[in-house]
Amino acid sequence: VSKNRLEKYRERFRYINSNFKNVKKIAMKSKFLPCHGIIFDLGVSSLQLDKESRGFSFRRKAPLDMRFSINQTLTAKDVLNTFSESEISDILYQYGEERQSRKIAKLIVENRPLSYADELSDIIKNNIRQTNYKINPSTKTFQALRIYINEELNSLSQDLEQSLEILGPGG
């Protein structure tokens, strides 16, 4: 969608679909240095989220995967079934700002093994008091797992550092 919207600027704009952490490598390979500006689409693609096989949605019986790229090895199922209660709690709190992270982590460990997204969602929905009726009580847990699995914050941090290196003066 973004690419189509920016088509009229193709002389001044290059559309690249890649992980943020590759920005410097791509700029050097494409020989458009120095860059005068960089635009990042930080939103999550609904095309990826809607793929049932990835387990991003808590509304479907889908494997607990949550990887954006199948080249990654760690899945949500791995995290939920092998990490300690403390590690899971930390992930939920740090990446999802989940206030009930300890209780959810305890429930996860007590209900192992987990294989499907709807299983995890049901455990949370049936045991966690809902404080915000506008969002599903599983939302923050799924967000936290997705961010952790895909190293989204690490990628963004690397990207920002590299962006400063490839931006020209006044960029």
Language-model region placement:
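S-adenosyl-L-methionine-dependent methyltransferase catalytic core, i.e., the SAM/SAH-binding region
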Residues: V1-G171
